[in-house]
């Protein structure tokens, strides 16, 4: 018996997206495309049972960005330093230390997201040197 509210285990990001309401599916697919456009070699996986993208080869958990669907928004988790770097541009979005909420009923800020993803990737690569 599954606990009420327990998140199922998904095999793939496609499974995760397919399990969401139609409105969330559309935004998740769009966000996924934006991430892959920004970093084409990002590896997709599930982490904490939600879609994650490793931005560098064999990247650890803190070298990934994640996304998750909620009732009224998509949570995007690019890392605290990324949120800090783009805080002025995120002023119209609810955001915390390492996350930002993109409402389902508003267009995604495609250019901003691409720049955030590239910033995080470049930050990771710089730390590796």
Regions found by a protein language model. Name each.
Residues 1-129:
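Charge-dense, helix-prone N-terminal extensions
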């Amino acid at each position: 018996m599954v606990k009420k509210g327990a998140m199922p285990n998904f095999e793939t990001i496609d499974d995760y997206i397919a399990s969401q309401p139609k409105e969330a599916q559309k935004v998740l697919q769009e966000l996924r495309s934006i991430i892959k456009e920004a970093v084409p070699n990002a590896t997709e996986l599930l982490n904490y049972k939600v879609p994650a993208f490793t931005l560098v080869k064999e990247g650890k958990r803190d070298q990934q960005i994640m996304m998750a669907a909620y009732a009224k928004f998509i949570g995007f988790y690019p890392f605290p330093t990324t949120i800090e770097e783009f805080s002025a541009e995120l002023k119209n979005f609810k955001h915390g230390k390492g996350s930002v909420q993109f409402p389902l009923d508003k267009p995604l800020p495609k250019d901003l997201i691409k720049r955030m993803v590239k910033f995080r990737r470049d930050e990771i690569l710089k730390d590796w040197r």
